[in-house]
């Protein structure tokens, strides 16, 4: 067929990309290494396997991931269709039966006449044709070696994530803005000062905190520059304050003296609506992170948009390598999608695949523009972040309202998320009119919606 697309990886991103491209009349060859070869984390034989939790997180528009799900629903997402068809009771979250979910997606993909599913490992990137790489966080060694030829030293094999808090949840009476030795702009960093007693209590909490147990395939050899903060605390009382919590070159303007220790917060985006805890990569459990980090002066009411983690995760430095369309700058016939781009989470991976599939199809069928979604939408905010973030400090990110452009005018904090969601869905409507396939979707078989889950 004239318009053909190769997709490597049939997880959530790859399946969503294949579905969106096929809906637009593009012939897709979808490569999946299972069942011939499996990663240590995969157990089911089918496509779109949920490796960790069976939850796609909150469904409310008060959460950015809830908004992202609604945008995908309105865009005709296969992954959201499968989730709704296989959901199980989970309060305010959208959780699924993972076996039925995989079965549903597998049935839809294999039934589509424009999608050719090929089993077996792809150990190299095709030299010709349009390609979407959606090989996921556990990309095989052979494929990773091929990818390194495209990405150089900007392909990573584990993440080292520090928590991120919203700027408006910080207590500005306790934190102060300053860069070490007065270098840089005054508010490049915010600083949380600790006296000796506060520091000792904090170190003790880190030593006692509950840690996440690493699965066998996630056991890491930590480099000194990426050591979990709790491991540093365990080396001795003063290790942290001579490491990431060192106070040298910082003077608290309220006391006129150098604090005993300091936790620095660095702006995560240009708008400075989010700050990350510098050097605070951690393997503490999420409840422990919230509890312990809220004992830090100035963070007592911190709202966390991302919590820390360290685990096996193959991903690229997307802002250094990708265009806003998720195309490789050095070779635009190649797209990346899913967690390998640096998005974090099931729904985010599906969203990334959704966009890659649409854009690849538009380019292959000669549409006039790639139709990048508006930055006001969850889809647009997420892809804008991963392709425009600070190259020097890039780490995986899930969708959150801190990524969105500010609202105009003064909005009450409790109304902000609702207004952001309202604006997003209004922007989405016009965008979907441009990118949606014809009402009669090319090649989709009659009754394809019906999947027997018995």
UniProtKB/Swiss-Prot annotation:
Cellular component, GO annotation: cytosol
Q: Which UniProt keywords apply?
A: Cytoplasm, FAD, Flavoprotein, Methyltransferase, NAD, NADP, Transferase, tRNA processing
User: Where on this chain does FAD bind?
Assistant: 9-14
**Where can this protein be found?**
Cytoplasm
EC id:
2.1.1.74
One family name in Pfam for this protein = GIDA
- Which reaction equations make up its catalytic activity? uridine(54) in tRNA + (6R)-5,10-methylene-5,6,7,8-tetrahydrofolate + NADH + H(+) = 5-methyluridine(54) in tRNA + (6S)-5,6,7,8-tetrahydrofolate + NAD(+); uridine(54) in tRNA + (6R)-5,10-methylene-5,6,7,8-tetrahydrofolate + NADPH + H(+) = 5-methyluridine(54) in tRNA + (6S)-5,6,7,8-tetrahydrofolate + NADP(+)
Q: Which GO terms describe its biological process?
A: tRNA methylation; tRNA wobble uridine modification
Primary residence: cytoplasm
A molecular function GO annotation: tRNA (uracil(54)-C5)-methyltransferase activity, 5,10-methylenetetrahydrofolate-dependent
Required cofactor names: FAD
Provide the residue span(s) of the region labelled Disordered.
432-454
InterPro entries, per database record: FAD/NAD-bd_sf, MnmG-rel, MnmG_N, TrmFO
Q: What does this protein do?
A: Catalyzes the folate-dependent formation of 5-methyl-uridine at position 54 (M-5-U54) in all tRNAs.
The record, for HAMAP family, names: TrmFO
Q: Which family does it belong to?
A: Belongs to the MnmG family. TrmFO subfamily.
Name of the protein in question: Methylenetetrahydrofolate--tRNA-(uracil-5-)-methyltransferase TrmFO
Q: Which organism is it from?
A: Pelobacter propionicus (strain DSM 2379 / NBRC 103807 / OttBd1)
Q: Which gene encodes it?
A: trmFO
């Amino acid at each position: 067929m004239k318009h053909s697309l190769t997709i490597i990886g049939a997880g959530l991103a790859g399946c969503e990309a294949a579905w969106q491209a096929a809906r637009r009349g593009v012939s897709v060859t979808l490569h999946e290494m299972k069942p011939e070869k499996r990663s240590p984390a995969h157990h089911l034989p089918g496509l779109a396997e949920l490796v960790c939790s069976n939850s796609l997180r909150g469904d409310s528009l008060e959460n950015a991931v809830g908004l992202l799900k609604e945008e995908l629903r309105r865009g005709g997402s296969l992954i959201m269709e499968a989730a709704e068809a296989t959901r199980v009771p989970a309060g305010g979250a959208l959780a699924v039966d993972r076996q039925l979910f995989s079965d549903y997606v597998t049935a839809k993909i294999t039934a589509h006449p424009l999608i050719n599913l090929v089993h077996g490992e792809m150990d190299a990137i095709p030299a010709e044709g349009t390609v979407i790489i959606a090989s996921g966080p556990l990309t095989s060694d052979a494929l990773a070696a091929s990818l390194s030829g495209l990405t150089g030293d900007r392909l990573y094999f584990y993440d080292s994530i520090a928590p991120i808090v919203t700027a408006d949840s910080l207590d500005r009476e306790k934190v102060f803005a300053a860069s070490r030795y007065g270098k840089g702009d005054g508010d490049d960093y915010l600083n949380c000062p600790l006296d000796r007693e506060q520091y000792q209590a904090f170190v003790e909490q880190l030593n006692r905190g509950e840690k996440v147990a690493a699965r066998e395939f996630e056991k890491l050899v930590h480099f000194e520059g990426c050591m979990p903060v709790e491991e540093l605390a365990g080396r001795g009382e003063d290790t942290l304050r001579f490491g990431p919590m060192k106070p040298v070159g910082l003077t608290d303007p309220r006391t006129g003296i150098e604090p005993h220790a300091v936790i620095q917060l660095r702006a995560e985006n240009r708008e400075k609506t989010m700050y990350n805890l510098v050097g605070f990569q951690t393997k503490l459990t999420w409840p422990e992170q919230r509890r312990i980090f809220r004992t830090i002066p100035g963070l007592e009411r911190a709202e966390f948009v991302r919590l820390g983690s360290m685990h096996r995760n193959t991903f690229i430095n997307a802002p250094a390598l990708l265009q806003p369309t998720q195309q490789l700058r050095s070779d635009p016939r190649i797209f990346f999608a899913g967690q390998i781009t640096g998005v974090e989470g099931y729904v985010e991976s599906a969203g990334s695949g959704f966009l890659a599939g649409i854009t690849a199809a538009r380019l292959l069928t000669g549409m006039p523009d790639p139709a990048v979604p508006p930055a006001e939408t969850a889809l647009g905010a997420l892809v804008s972040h991963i392709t425009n973030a600070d190259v020097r400090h890039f780490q995986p990110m899930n969708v959150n309202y801190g990524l969105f452009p500010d609202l105009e005018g003064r909005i009450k904090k409790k109304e902000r998320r609702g207004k952001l969601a309202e604006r997003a869905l209004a922007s989405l409507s016009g965008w979907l009119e441009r990118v949606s396939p014809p009402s009669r979707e090319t090649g989709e078989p009659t009754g394809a919606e019906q999947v027997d889950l018995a």
